[in-house]
Regions:
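Short, low-complexity, Pro/Ser/Thr/Gly-rich segments in the mature regions of secreted, periplasmic
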Residues: 111-126
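C-terminal motif of bacterial Sec signal peptides marking the signal peptidase cleavage site
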Residues: 8-11
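Periplasmic/extracellular electron-transfer cofactor-ligation site
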Residues: 15-19, 23-26, 31-60, 80-87, ...
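Sec-dependent N-terminal signal peptides
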Residues: 1-4
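Extracytoplasmic electron-transfer domains, predominantly the class I c-type cytochrome c fold
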Residues: 56-110
C-alpha cells in the first residue's frame, strides 16, 4: 500500500495552472493528461512540468523540451513502457488518453532541441 501511495505522489501532476497550452487548443486535454500522468518523471514546459531530474531520483525520464518526438514514438513509449531499458510504467494511460498525450508530446516536445540544418539551409550557430 505504501508503494502505491508513493507511486501516486510521483505520478501526480502540477495542475492546470502551469499549462502554457490554451483551453481552446485541440491538444489541451493531452496537456492536462500529460501533467497528471507524466510530470513525475518528464520535463515539458508546455505542460508546466519539471520531471524528477531536479530531485535526483532514478525515475528521471527524458527532458522533452530538448528531445523531439513523433506521434508514433510517443504512443509506442506510452504503450510499451518507453524504449529498451526504460523504467517507464507500461500503459500508464490507454486508448484515447494515450493518443491525446502522444499528439500533445509530438506537437510540443523539442522546443529547445538543437536541430541540424536541412539541406540547403545554413546553421545559425557560430
Amino acid at each position: 500500500m505504501l508503494v502505491a501511495a508513493a507511486f501516486g505522489l510521483v505520478a501526480c501532476g502540477y495542475g492546470e495552472e502551469k499549462l502554457s497550452v490554451s483551453k481552446d487548443d485541440p491538444d489541451y486535454n493531452g496537456a492536462v493528461l500529460f501533467s497528471t500522468h507524466c510530470s513525475g518523471c518528464h520535463t515539458l514546459s508546455a505542460a508546466g512540468t519539471q520531471g524528477s531530474g531536479n530531485r535526483g531520483e532514478r525515475t528521471q525520464g527524458p527532458n522533452l523540451n530538448q528531445r523531439e518526438e513523433t506521434y508514433e514514438d510517443a504512443l509506442f513509449a506510452i504503450q510499451n513502457g518507453g524504449f529498451s531499458g526504460a523504467i517507464m510504467p507500461q500503459n500508464i494511460v490507454v486508448g484515447k488518453e494515450a493518443e491525446e498525450i502522444a499528439r500533445f508530446v509530438a506537437k510540443y516536445a523539442g522546443e529547445d532541441a538543437e536541430t541540424s540544418p536541412r539541406p540547403g539551409e545554413t546553421s545559425s550557430s557560430p
